[in-house]
Regions:
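Flexible, glycine-rich active-site loops centered on histidine and acidic residues
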Residues: 96-101, 123-124, 135, 176
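Flexible, small-/acidic-enriched active-site or ligand-binding loops
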Residues: 136, 194-223
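Short Gly/Pro-enriched turn/cap motifs at secondary-structure boundaries
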Residues: 89, 114, 129-132, 157-160, ...
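A short, Trp-centered hydrophobic/proline-enriched beta-strand micro-motif
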Residues: 117-125, 170
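A short core secondary-structure module
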Residues: 148-200
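A structural signal for short hydrophobic beta-strand segments in well-ordered beta-sheet cores
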Residues: 139-142
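Alpha-helical interface subdomain recognition
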Residues: 1-89, 101-106, 113-118, 131-134, ...
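Short Ser/Thr-interspersed hydrophobic loop/turn segments at strand-loop and sheet-helix junctions
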Residues: 53, 76-81, 171-172, 191-196, ...
Length: 388
């Protein structure tokens, strides 16, 4: 495996790092205190990201993006991940599901405007009674005699649906009989904002990712044409799986960035904070914490980089993605907690980013596949060779 970077790759990472420090960090206090990211600020940051060349850097060049390889993309995401997530999100186009399964017309209608910063997308899978269990969803799609589809049901926890121009909604579309019993079939649909019967309601307040909104989506006899299907009929589960692995790596890379920021604060504080006549970094209780934090950070980074390298080689597996996401998200929880402990009471003050990183860390072990789901994937992969 080769993790060394070319001068061009280093320039991309350095440009992203400087952009985060100059354009994102200054707005963190506003977003954290108000829980709101104003639309004019979103557009301002997005325009600067496009001008700088970092917006849509993860999208292939043939579609107008930057064409980053996976390894560089993850390091780019790591730098963006150091900022408040709502601000981070304004800098990246993420319609990878359309890349994976969209038709030429769908890419022209939906993908291209997203890459150009003219449209926003959102993804609707989670339901009040269907989180990790995608096949447990009850929101439904029914085909009519004319070939159109009618959608009904509710989705929730849908990120930035309040400003999205269209939604990719995953719906239960049929039942297949298998040796293990009935299996629910899923189909993905494009649903444009303003479609009759499609309603977006305000979601929930939460402790993580302030400013990064979530919404409740209601579908009441929403009629969409067959051309709105993303991928194939009843193949929505496959559509989701095509991009979910890369998304988990992105989450892991974001965790690396946050952990690195918290760790750097902890090192500086330990080296300069004086107690009992010496810096607290000289006390074994503090120095051992720093040692453990450094080791966990390095281990998570190596798993992320290895998975990214293998992804570019076409050899990455579900096991690689699960281990990387699990390790990085749990490492962030540990590092952010210990960084606060090293700072003492000051670590809980909003003048520092530590309490925000600590709050945000809690979400990373839940979304894009809980830690329990990742462990299930890992153990299943290990035991599969011994199954009859």
């Amino acid at each position: 495996m080769e993790f060394s970077l070319s001068e061009e790759q280093k320039l991309i990472i350095d440009t992203t790092k400087k952009f985060v420090e100059s354009e994102l960090f200054p707005h963190e206090e506003l977003v954290e205190k108000t829980g709101n990211l104003p639309m004019d600020l979103i557009k301002e940051i997005q325009a600067k990201a496009i001008k700088t060349g970092i917006y849509a850097a993860n999208i292939p060049q043939e579609f107008g993006g930057g064409g980053l390889d996976t390894l560089t993309w993850l390091l780019y995401e790591k730098e963006l991940g150091k900022a408040n997530y709502a601000l981070h999100w304004t800098c990246v186009a993420r319609p990878s599901n359309i890349l994976c399964a969209g038709t030429k017309d769908q890419k022209e209608k939906y993908l291209k405007p997203c890459i150009e910063g003219k449209k926003w997308d959102c993804l609707a899978m989670t339901e009040p009674n269907a989180g990790s269990d995608l096949r447990g969803m009850t929101a439904s799609a029914r085909e009519t005699t004319s070939g159109d589809w009618v959608l009904n049901g509710t989705k929730h926890f849908i990120s930035h649906a309040d400003i999205a121009d269209f939604t990719i909604a995953f719906m239960a579309s049929g039942i297949e009989e298998t040796n293990k019993g009935p299996k629910k079939l899923i189909t993905a649909f494009f649903v444009d904002k303003g479609t009759p019967g499609f309603n977006v309601r305000e979601g929930y307040d939460n402790v993580s990712h302030r400013g990064y909104t979530n919404s409740i989506l209601e579908f009441s006899d929403v009629k969409v044409p067959k051309e709105s299907i993303l991928g194939e009929v009843h193949k929505g589960f496959e559509v989701a799986n095509k991009w979910l692995g890369a998304t988990r790596l992105q989450v892991g890379a974001t965790c690396l960035g946050r952990a690195e920021r918290a760790f750097n604060h902890a090192i500086e504080w330990a080296a300069t904070r004086q107690q009992f006549g010496q810096s607290i970094g000289k006390f074994q209780g503090t120095s051992f914490k720093l040692s453990d934090m450094a080791m966990e950070l390095k281990a998570a980074q190596l798993l992320i980089l290895e998975a990214g390298w293998k992804y570019d080689q076409g050899t990455a597996t579900d096991l690689d993605m699960a281990m990387a996401k699990l390790k990085a998200s749990e490492m962030l929880a540990m590092v952010s907690d210990e960084a606060i402990q090293i700072h003492g009471g000051m670590g809980l003050m909003t003048e520092l980013p530590l309490e925000r990183i600590w709050r945000d860390a809690r979400l990373e072990r839940i979304w894009e596949g809980t830690s329990e789901i990742q462990r299930h994937i890992i153990s299943r992969s290990l035991l599969r060779p011994y199954e009859n």
